Amino acid sequence: MSLNNSSNVFLDSVPSNTNRFQVSVINENHESSAAADDNTDPPHYEETSFGDEAQKRLRISFRPGNQECYDNFLQSGETAKTDASFHAYDSHTNTYYLQTFGHNTMDAVPKIEYYRNTGSISGPKVNRPSLLEIHEQLAKNVAVTPSSADRVANGDGIPGDEQAENKEDDQAGVVKFGWVKGVLVRCMLNIWGVMLFIRLSWIVGEAGIGLGVLIILLSTMVTSITGLSTSAIATNGFVRGGGAYYLISRSLGPEFGGSIGLIFAFANAVAVAMYVVGFAETVVDLLKESDSMMVDPTNDIRIIGSITVVILLGISVAGMEWEAKAQVILLVILLIAIANFFIGTVIPSNNEKKSRGFFNYQASIFAENFGPRFTKGEGFFSVFAIFFPAATGILAGANISGDLEDPQDAIPRGTMLAIFITTVAYLGVAICVGACVVRDATGNMNDTIISGMNCNGSAACGLGYDFSRCRHEPCQYGLMNNFQVMSMVSGFGPLITAGIFSATLSSALASLVSAPKVFQALCKDNIYKALQFFAKGYGKNNEPLRGYILTFLIAMAFILIAELNTIAPIISNFFLASYALINFSCFHASYAKSPGWRPAYGIYNMWVSLFGAVLCCAVMFVINWWAAVITYVIEFFLYVYVTCKKPDVNWGSSTQALSYVSALDNALELTTVEDHVKNFRPQCIVLTGGPMTRPALLDITHAFTKNSGLCICCEVFVGPRKLCVKEMNSGMAKKQAWLIKNKIKAFYAAVAADCFRDGVRSLLQASGLGRMKPNTLVIGYKKNWRKAPLTEIENYVGIIHDAFDFEIGVVIVRISQGFDISQVLQVQEELERLEQERLALEATIKDNECEEESGGIRGLFKKAGKLNITKTTPKKDGSINTSQSMHVGEFNQKLVEASTQFKKKQEKGTIDVWWLFDDGGLTLLIPYILTLRKKWKDCKLRIYVGGKINRIEEEKIVMASLLSKFRIKFADIHIIGDINIRPNKESWKVFEEMIEPYRLHESCKDLTTAEKLKRETPWKITDAELEAVKEKSYRQVRLNELLQEHSRAANLIVLSLPVARKGSISDLLYMAWLEILTKNLPPVLLVRGNHKNVLTFYS
C-alpha cells in the first residue's frame, strides 16, 4: 500500500467509523493544495498540528475509535511497509517510515526482518536505523547514500551479498513436510520396531501382564519426559536441521553438542545395519522353512542385508519426497499388520492354535499371566533392557528438522502424539496377548484332557489341555518359547511377516536419512575441521550425498559382521546419552534463568527434565553397564577435544547464561565479605591505550595478575565527544578479541573525555564491580617528557596524584626503548592493505587475460620486491616479527624486539627489589608473584633496603626475619648504609643540566621581574623549590649511582616510587627525579602501594 495512492492510510485498513486518526499526505511544494485539503476535512475531526515545518508535509487527524480496531490494524502488518516514493536519502526534508503512526521519523516499526540471521535464523536480514542515526542532529542539504538496509526497508530490493546468502532459502520447489508426514509418521515407524512383533509376547511371558505394563510405562516415562524437553527446546526459537545435535549444541554449547552429535550420527549409521540385519534374519527364517538357503545363515544375512541397504540408499538419494512416500506406504502396512493381530484375537481359535497355547480372551489366562515368572538368568531389569530399545526413536522427526515446514509446531505435536499412539499400541498388544495365550504349550493337539478330570490348576488345564510336561522339558510354543506368537494369533499370518518387514525397513530408512542430516549439520558448524568435506549439500533440498555414502559404508561394514548382540547395547546407550543431554539441556536452560529462554511449549518442568536426565543415565547402566561406560568415555574424550580446540562459535548457550549467573552471584556474595590482608590481590588498571599498541606494558602486568588478580586494559579517547564515542564503540569488540586471541586474561575498557586526566580519573573511580575494583594503577614511563607539551606532563603527573587521592597504588614501568609500537602497527596495516590491493589487481589482470598489461604490472611489483625494506607481521603468539619488505628503521626494529621481551622466558638472573620505603608491602609482593611464573622462575629475589652503616648486620638479621615470617624466599639481602651521602659531582651535573631549561632563576632577577615570570610561567622550577627539596634531589641522583653499581645486570629492578607532595614539588621537577632515578638501567618497576598492608605473617 503506497501513501501516494491513498491519502488516508487508516481508511484503507479499517472501517471509517472506527478510525482513531488519519494521515493525509500533503505535497510539500503546494501549500495551497494543503490548505484546500484542510478546508475539506469533515467538521467532526479534531486536528492537531506539529509545528510549521511538519504542517507543510503531513497532517494527523484524530478520529474517535476503539483500541481493538487500532490493535487489529497494527497486527495487520501494514505498518511494516514503507512507501517507495519516500526516500531516506534526504535527511532533512523527507519523511521516514511515514506509516509509523503518521510521525515524521526514521524510527521503524517492529519487523521480523530486523531479527533474522542472529545465529539461528536464516532469511534476509535488514538493519533497523541505528541509535546514532535517529539521535544525531540532521545536517541540512546533505545527500546521504542509501544503505542496503534503507533499500530493503523502502522496498527497493535485497542487497546482493544477502541475496547470495539466502539463495538456498529462496529456491522454489524445496520439499518441506508437515507435522504428520514429517514427524508423526517417522516417529511411529521408528518406535514400532521389530520388538513389537517378536519380543513383546516373550516380555509378557517373563514379566507378566502387570510388570510388563510397568516396563512399558517406565520406558514411556523416559521417552515422554524427553519428548517434553525436546518440545520445549524446539519451540525456543527457530530450529534448523540437525535434530538432536542442533538442540543440544544450541542449548549447552559446542562442547556437549559436538561430542554427542558425532556419536549420535554414528549410532544412527550403525542402527541402519541393526535394522537391516533384523530384516535379513526374518527373510533367512522364511528361506529355511522353504528350504531355499543360498549359502548358510550367516552369509545369507550378509547377502540379503547388502542388497537391502543398497536399495534403501537409492530411495534416500532419490530425495526426501520419495523417502517420505516410502515411509507412508510402510506405515500403512504396519498399521494393517497391527490391526490384523487385534482382529485375530477375537476370531475363534482352532485346535491347532489351542495346542500352541492360544484360547482367545480368557479371564483365567489373564489371571495366570498377570504375575511374573522369570526364567533362570532373567529379572525385571534384564527384561526391561531388552524392551527399552523398542521405545526409542522419538527423535526421528526432530532429526530432519531442517526439512519441516514449521519445526516449532511439528516437533512437539508429532513427537508427543507418536509417543501416545505407540504406547497405547504396546499396552494393547501386551494385555491382549497376555489374556489370550498361555506361557507354555506343546503344540501337540493330542494333549487334551477329558472334561471334569482333576487339573493341575493351570488355565490350560481348565480349558481342556494338559501342558504340564513343559515344566520338565522344553516346549516350542507359548509366550515363553515362541517368538512368532503374534503371527499365530493374527487373522492372517503373512501380514505379520509384512509388518516385521515394514517395521525393520522403515526404521532402517529413517536412520539412513537421520544420520547424514545430523552429520551434515555437525560438519557445517566446523567444530571438527577435518570433517568439513561432508558439509556440502546437493540439489534443491541440500541433500548430504557425501554423508549418505559414508553412512552406507558404515552400515555395510556392520552388516558384514552379521551379529548384533554385541553392538546393539552400545547403540541403545548412544541414543540414551542423547536423551539424557536433551533433558539436561532443558533443565540447564531453565536453571540459568536467561531472558532468552522463552519456549512456546509450556508443558515442561525443569526438575522433571533433570529427573529424566538422571533416569536416562540409570537406564544406560541397567541395559548394559560396560556399554554405558564406553559411551561416557567416548563422550568425555570428544568433549575434551572440542573444549581444547575452542571452536569459533557463539550460540548463546545456557552454559554461557549460567556462567553469567554464577559470576553475578559470586560478585554479589563477595560484597558481603570484608577485605582481609590475606586475600589481597593486585587488581590493576593498565593505561595501555589499545592493548596491541603497548604489548610489553601489558605483558609485565599480566605476569603478576594472571590467575591471581584483575587486569583492565584502559584507553582514553580525547577530543570531541561525538567523534571519540564513535571511534571508541567501533573498536571495543576488536580489542577485547585481541586479548582473547593472545590468551591474555584481561578486560578492555575505554572512556571518552575532554582531556586525558579526566578520562583516567573516571576510570579510577568507576572501573570494577563490587570488591573487584582496581587497587593499583599501572602506567608506562613517559620517556619523551622533555619534548612533550606542558599539558601532557601536567596530565601525566596529575593522574599519579589522582591515584594517591583515591588511595590506589601506582606502578610506573620503564624500559629502554619505550612501549608504544603504534607506528609499527600502522606500517603493518599499510603493508597488508597494499598486499591485498596487489593480489586483487593481479587477480583482475589474470581474469581479464590481459597478458601484456599483466606482465608490466607484475614486473613493477617484482622490482618493488627487491627493495631492502622491512615488513612487520604478527606471529601466532601476538608478537611482531620482522622480515625484509619495507624499511622501518633500526630504531623500530629495536622497539619491536623490546615489545616482546616480557613474552619470552627470562634468563637465569635476579629481580632486584629496592624496598626503600614501607608502602604496605606491594613493592615486595609484586616481584614475589613474578617469581612464581614459569617465565620468571629462574630469577631469584635480591632485597635492598636502607640502613645505618654501623648497624648493617643487625638490620640484615631483622629484615631476614621479617621476610621469613612473610614466607618469601630470597637469594640475598643487602643493607645500603650510604644512601644519604651526596652524589658525585658528575652525576649531580647531569641532573642540573636536565632541569636547567625548566628553571626560573628568580634569585638572579629583581623582585618585579621575578614575580612577573612566576605569573607567566608558573610551571617552572623556582630556586626556592629546588633549595627546599635539595636533599631529596640528592637522594634520587645517589640512588641511580647505587642502582648502577649493584643492579645493572639484573633482569628486573623493582624500586620504591618517590612521592611528590602536592603543592611542594612541581611537575617538571618530579619528572626529572624519575628520569635521573631510572636512567640507563634494565627494566624498572617504580612501585608505591596505598600504604595499607598487603602482606601479613599471621595465619
Curated annotation (Swiss-Prot):
<dbReference type="GO" id="GO:0055064">
    <property type="term" value="P:chloride ion homeostasis"/>
</dbReference>
<keyword id="KW-0739">Sodium transport</keyword>
<dbReference type="Pfam" id="PF08403">
    <property type="entry name" value="AA_permease_N"/>
</dbReference>
<keyword id="KW-0769">Symport</keyword>
<feature type="short sequence motif" description="RFXV motif">
    <location>
        <begin position="20"/>
        <end position="23"/>
    </location>
</feature>
<feature type="transmembrane region" description="Helical">
    <location>
        <begin position="328"/>
        <end position="348"/>
    </location>
</feature>
<feature type="topological domain" description="Extracellular">
    <location>
        <begin position="439"/>
        <end position="550"/>
    </location>
</feature>
<dbReference type="Pfam" id="PF00324">
    <property type="entry name" value="AA_permease"/>
</dbReference>
<feature type="modified residue" description="Phosphothreonine">
    <location>
        <position position="95"/>
    </location>
</feature>
<feature type="topological domain" description="Extracellular">
    <location>
        <begin position="281"/>
        <end position="302"/>
    </location>
</feature>
<dbReference type="InterPro" id="IPR002443">
    <property type="entry name" value="SLC12A1/SLC12A2"/>
</dbReference>
<keyword id="KW-0523">Neurodegeneration</keyword>
<keyword id="KW-0472">Membrane</keyword>
<feature type="transmembrane region" description="Helical">
    <location>
        <begin position="202"/>
        <end position="222"/>
    </location>
</feature>
<feature type="topological domain" description="Cytoplasmic">
    <location>
        <begin position="631"/>
        <end position="1099"/>
    </location>
</feature>
<feature type="modified residue" description="Phosphoserine; by AMPK">
    <location>
        <position position="130"/>
    </location>
</feature>
<keyword id="KW-1133">Transmembrane helix</keyword>
<protein>
    <recommendedName>
        <fullName>Solute carrier family 12 member 1</fullName>
    </recommendedName>
</protein>
<feature type="transmembrane region" description="Helical">
    <location>
        <begin position="572"/>
        <end position="592"/>
    </location>
</feature>
<dbReference type="GO" id="GO:0006884">
    <property type="term" value="P:cell volume homeostasis"/>
</dbReference>
<dbReference type="GO" id="GO:0034220">
    <property type="term" value="P:monoatomic ion transmembrane transport"/>
</dbReference>
<feature type="topological domain" description="Extracellular">
    <location>
        <begin position="593"/>
        <end position="609"/>
    </location>
</feature>
<dbReference type="InterPro" id="IPR002445">
    <property type="entry name" value="Slc12a1"/>
</dbReference>
<feature type="topological domain" description="Extracellular">
    <location>
        <begin position="349"/>
        <end position="379"/>
    </location>
</feature>
<feature type="transmembrane region" description="Helical">
    <location>
        <begin position="551"/>
        <end position="571"/>
    </location>
</feature>
<comment type="subunit">
    <text>When phosphorylated, interacts with PPP3CB.</text>
</comment>
<feature type="topological domain" description="Cytoplasmic">
    <location>
        <begin position="1"/>
        <end position="177"/>
    </location>
</feature>
<keyword id="KW-0325">Glycoprotein</keyword>
<dbReference type="GO" id="GO:0016324">
    <property type="term" value="C:apical plasma membrane"/>
</dbReference>
<dbReference type="InterPro" id="IPR018491">
    <property type="entry name" value="SLC12_C"/>
</dbReference>
<dbReference type="GO" id="GO:0055078">
    <property type="term" value="P:sodium ion homeostasis"/>
</dbReference>
<feature type="transmembrane region" description="Helical">
    <location>
        <begin position="303"/>
        <end position="323"/>
    </location>
</feature>
<keyword id="KW-0597">Phosphoprotein</keyword>
<feature type="transmembrane region" description="Helical">
    <location>
        <begin position="380"/>
        <end position="400"/>
    </location>
</feature>
<keyword id="KW-0812">Transmembrane</keyword>
<comment type="function">
    <text>Renal sodium, potassium and chloride ion cotransporter that mediates the transepithelial NaCl reabsorption in the thick ascending limb and plays an essential role in the urinary concentration and volume regulation. Electrically silent transporter system.</text>
</comment>
<feature type="modified residue" description="Phosphoserine">
    <location>
        <position position="148"/>
    </location>
</feature>
<feature type="topological domain" description="Cytoplasmic">
    <location>
        <begin position="401"/>
        <end position="417"/>
    </location>
</feature>
<keyword id="KW-0406">Ion transport</keyword>
<feature type="modified residue" description="Phosphothreonine">
    <location>
        <position position="118"/>
    </location>
</feature>
<dbReference type="GO" id="GO:0006811">
    <property type="term" value="P:monoatomic ion transport"/>
</dbReference>
<feature type="transmembrane region" description="Helical">
    <location>
        <begin position="260"/>
        <end position="280"/>
    </location>
</feature>
